[in-house]
Amino acid sequence: MNISLKNTVFVFDLDDTLYKEADYHASGVRAVAKKVKSLYGVDVYSYLQSCIKHDEADLWGALCLHLDLPLTEKQSFIWEYRLHQPDITLSRANQNLLALLEETAAGLAILTDGRSTTQRLKLKALGLAHLPCFISGEHGGADKPDPRRFQQIANKFPNYDYLYIGDNPNKDFLAPNQLRWKTCGLTGDHRNIYSQEVSHLDKSYWPQYWITELTELTGLINA
C-alpha cells in the first residue's frame, strides 16, 4: 500500500485504535469507586477489581448487591461511568503522528461509534476535540458498517483519496472497502475489547493492510 500524503484524508477509529479502550474502562471504574466512597464511605475499588478479574457480567448490578442497594441504583453507576472525565492519554508516538498528519495530509478526521457525550469526553481528554469527529450517536445511531458517515467525510473533503484505520474487522472496514477507500487494520493484544479474528468473515470485511503500530503508517506514505 502506497499513500500520497498530500492527496489522502486520514480517518481514524477511536477506541482501541488511537488509545486502549481498557484504559478508559479502568478510568471509569476508578470514577465510580470514588463516587461510592464519597456517598457511602465505603471503598469498593478492590471489590470492583475482583469482579472484573472474575469476568462478572453485570458489574454495576453486582456493586448494588455488594452495597445492599436496590438494583435501580445501577443506572446511577452506569451514568457516573459514562459521564466521568476520563483519565486517558495518547502515546507520545501517536501524538507525533497525528500532529504530522494534521499539518501535512489532505485532511484528518475521526469516525467512531458510541454516545455523543461519552465520546466527546474521550476526545477532550486525548486533546483531539478540535478535529472533525463523526460519532454514531450524533448521526441517528448509525453504527458501522453503515456507510453514511464515511460518505459525509468524503463530502466534507471532496476529490481526495481516503484511508480508514481501525481495529475491529467485524464492522470497521466493510463500508470503506465498498466505497473504494483504502483500509488499514491495527493489530491489538489481549487488552483489546473486540476479537480481530477474520477467518469467519467474508473478505469484504477484511482491511486491505495490517499494521502493528500506527507509526508504521509513515513507512507507507509518499510525500
Model segments located where?
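Active-site neighborhood of HAD-like aspartate-dependent phosphohydrolases
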Residues: 1-45
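Small/polar loops that bind or transfer phosphate-bearing groups
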Residues: 20, 110-111
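Alpha-helical elements of Rossmann-like donor-binding domains used by nucleotide-donor carbohydrate transfer enzymes
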Residues: 27, 31, 62, 96, ...
